[in-house]
């Protein structure tokens, strides 16, 4: 829900407010968010349910919040902690002294998207002679690869995945490689379905073509090695695989650090070098940036360092075991309900399911689960793959697994009783005829009003939250998701850009 009346006075008060008042305002705003603890949110946050860990991370963050990563010589504490985080990630992912990848190096970034953008940049800039570079990715690859291609003006060649295995065919990826290809990417695991791509085969075809191979392990790559140690059949995906040149892994996911920390690893320093940006042709300080940002708060880095130190290898092994058992329990709950089926057998920390023929409307089911306190992530249909429900499973879910099965069965029953969502005839006709180019601001406002998104486009007001789309979102999103599901991907993108643009309007505050 969006309730801008809570910030009706604006962020900049005339004379300042007391510290406890400002903090109380933040807490009131946070009360409208999804719950970040308690094991009922299956996306966005990663909660290990370890007592005291939040307090430790917050204290470490506070110690380094105002330290600037712009200059590692001025603040050597950050350099030391970054190097330690890179070393830990490298070890977990098959690199370091005594391995077949002894020269692994890396950088700490703000998140998986930045890591992927930099992996693409390093591959592109390693070949300045290629004037029209390209990258090859499976259709299941994270959308951040498309973002990187867009930002860096690199062509994106997308190879479909099998509707049965949800994985790409290495031969199809090989066929997509051209003389201009600078990078081939794969996932371990994929975000949408939680399956591990055939990394060894993909890395081999990339190596045969003389092309870099990046493994996107941002999502569950930290956990996979621990699952293997627990006896799970995790295929090789890391630096033990010949031909893998870089790997990304998010510490703010299953390393359970607070948000804002990912690691991009390269097999050696020569592969990493094109990632850097340096500039001295101006009268100010000589700029050298290993990552995209220049100024970087040390808070997230210190919090991640403290988290890894506190949990330790044994702690992560224990959390992986707890999560594995939770995944198994949730998968069993899905199997037990008529009308649902697993879209993929769980291989990592994801449960992904869809409806069978005659099953419930998935988007109505998501709303029914939300009404029962379970916050799941709907995924739209795509290229022969059905709409699905995604569950990111963390250790905090384990105590709740027994509650999920009965609630899932009740939600399915309620979704059947409600019946599928039917788009109003005028909306269905509009979506069928609409193209991204034909989407006007007036059409967007009309769609927003018809879908119950905000207030549908009243004129911007005085900051009391009455700008276009500034009102609360609908309690049930099935109609919105149904409309998006009916639209082709290009139209979905444009619609979402416009809808979010309606939500993001400044709060001006009062003139008092």
Regions found by a protein language model. Give the residues of each.
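PLP-dependent aminotransferase-like
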Residues: 127-179
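Short Gly/Ser/Thr- and Asp/Glu-enriched loop/turn motifs at secondary-structure junctions
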Residues: 101-103, 344-350, 382-388
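Conserved beta-loop-alpha segment that forms the PLP phosphate-binding cup at the N-terminus of a helix
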Residues: 79-82, 86, 102-130, 144-148
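Active-site C-terminal subdomain of aminotransferase-like
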Residues: 229-349, 353-356
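Active-site nucleophile and cofactor-binding loops and adjacent substrate-binding regions
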Residues: 74-78, 106-113, 137-139, 344, ...
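Active-site pre-lysine segment of PLP-dependent enzymes
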Residues: 172, 196-208, 220-246
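Active-site phosphate-binding strand-loop segment of PLP-dependent enzymes
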Residues: 168-217
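Non-catalytic terminal extensions of PLP-dependent enzymes
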Residues: 1-79, 83-87, 354-512
């Amino acid at each position: 829900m969006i309730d801008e009346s809570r910030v009706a006075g604006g962020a900049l008060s005339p004379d300042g407010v007391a510290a406890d008042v400002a903090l109380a305002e933040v807490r009131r705003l946070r009360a409208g968010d999804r719950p970040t603890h308690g094991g009922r949110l299956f996306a966005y946050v990663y909660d290990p349910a370890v007592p005291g860990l939040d307090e430790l991370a917050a204290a470490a963050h506070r110690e380094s919040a105002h330290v600037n990563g712009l200059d590692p010589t001025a603040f050597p504490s950050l350099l030391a902690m970054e190097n330690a985080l890179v070393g830990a990630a490298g070890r977990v992912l098959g690199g370091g002294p005594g391995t077949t990848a002894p020269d692994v190096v890396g950088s700490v970034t703000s998140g998986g998207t930045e890591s992927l953008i930099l992996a693409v940049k390093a591959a592109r800039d390693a070949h300045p002679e290629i004037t029209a570079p390209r990258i090859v990715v499976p259709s299941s690859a994270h959308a951040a690869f498309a973002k990187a291609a867009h930002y860096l003006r690199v062509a994106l060649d997308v190879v479909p995945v099998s509707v049965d295995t949800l994985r790409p065919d290495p031969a199809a990826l090989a066929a997509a490689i051209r003389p201009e290809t600078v990078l081939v990417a794969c996932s371990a695991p994929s975000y949408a379905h939680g399956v591990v791509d055939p990394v060894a085969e993909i890395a081999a075809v990339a190596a045969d073509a003389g092309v870099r191979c990046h493994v996107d392990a941002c999502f569950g790559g930290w956990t996979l090695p621990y699952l293997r140690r627990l006896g799970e059949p995790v295929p090789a995906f890391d630096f033990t695989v010949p031909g893998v040149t870089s790997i990304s892994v998010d510490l703010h996911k299953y390393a359970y650090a607070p948000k804002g920390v990912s690691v991009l690893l390269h097999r050696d320093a020569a592969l990493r070098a094109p990632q850097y940006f340096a500039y001295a042709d101006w009268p100010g300080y000589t700029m050298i940036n290993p990552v995209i940002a220049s100024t970087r708060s040390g808070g997230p880095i210190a919090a991640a360092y403290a988290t890894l130190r506190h949990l330790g290898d044994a702690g992560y092994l224990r959390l992986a075991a707890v999560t594995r058992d939770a995944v198994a329990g949730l998968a069993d709950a899905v199997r037990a309900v008529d009308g649902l089926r697993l879209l993929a057998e769980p291989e990592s920390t994801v449960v992904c399911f869809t409806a069978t023929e005659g099953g419930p409307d998935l988007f109505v089911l998501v709303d029914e689960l939300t009404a029962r306190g379970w916050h799941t992530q709907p995924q739209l249909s795509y290229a022969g793959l059905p709409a699905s429900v995604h569950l990111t499973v963390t250790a905090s879910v384990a105590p709740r697994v027994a509650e999920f099965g009965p609630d899932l069965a009740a939600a399915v029953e309620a979704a059947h009783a409600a019946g599928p969502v039917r788009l109003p005839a005028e909306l269905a006709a509009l979506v069928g005829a609409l193209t991204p180019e034909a989407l006007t601001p007036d059409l967007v406002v009309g769609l927003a009003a018809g879908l119950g998104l905000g207030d549908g486009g009243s004129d911007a007001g005085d900051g009391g939250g009455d700008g276009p789309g500034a009102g609360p979102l609908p309690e049930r999103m099935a109609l919105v998701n149904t409309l998006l599901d009916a639209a082709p991907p290009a139209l979905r993108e444009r619609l979402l850009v416009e809808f979010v643009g309606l939500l993001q309007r400044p709060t001006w505050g009062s003139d008092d």
